[in-house]
UniProtKB/Swiss-Prot annotation:
A motif (Histidine triad motif) lies at residues 110-114. Its EC number is 3.9.1.-, 3.4.22.-. Homodimer. Interacts with CDK7. Interacts with RUVBL1 and RUVBL2 and is associated with the LEF1/TCF1-CTNNB1 complex and with a KAT5 histone acetyltransferase complex. Identified in a complex with MITF and CTNNB1. Interacts with CDC34 and RBX1, and is part of a SCF (SKP2-CUL1-F-box protein) E3 ubiquitin-protein ligase complex. Interacts with SUMO1, SUMO2 and RGS17. Interacts with the Ten-1 ICD form of TENM1. Interacts with CALM1; interaction increases in the presence of calcium ions. It catalyses: adenosine 5'-phosphoramidate + H2O = AMP + NH4(+). The modification N-acetylalanine is found at A2. This is Adenosine 5'-monophosphoramidase HINT1. Disruption phenotype: No visible phenotype. Mice display increased susceptibility to carcinogens. Keywords: Acetylation, Apoptosis, Cytoplasm, Hydrolase, Nucleotide-binding, Nucleus, Phosphoprotein, Protease, Thiol protease, Transcription, Transcription regulation, Ubl conjugation pathway. Residues 18-126 form the HIT domain. Transmembrane segments: none annotated. CDD domains: PKCI_related. The modification N6-acetyllysine is found at K21, K30. AMP binds at D43, I44, N99, G105, Q106, S107, H112, L113, H114.
Amino acid sequence: MADEIAKAQVAQPGGDTIFGKIIRKEIPAKIIFEDDRCLAFHDISPQAPTHFLVIPKKHISQISVADDDDESLLGHLMIVGKKCAADLGLKRGYRMVVNEGADGGQSVYHIHLHVLGGRQMNWPPG
């Protein structure tokens, strides 16, 4: 977790990201789901037994810059996350998280939905 916080503190908005490279298939990822609007894949640094990300193919750097036109797409990410969680056997529950900005732990400036499960989640999370 400390490593993720360190990454978030030095991450900068703007420019191409690792997620853009994954969308374009320039670098490999363990893809769970893909359609014309989004991509779901396993996190390379899992924080739970099951930890995957759902990202839009449209570049939106962070939730604070999303606008009303993005509403359907952002909802679609949650529905895809729910379906992937079911496909991966997360029957007892899971957590969906979107990090916003450096203080919120955002380490990649391409909005992404974390889905974590396979263990009891703690509260508060941070």
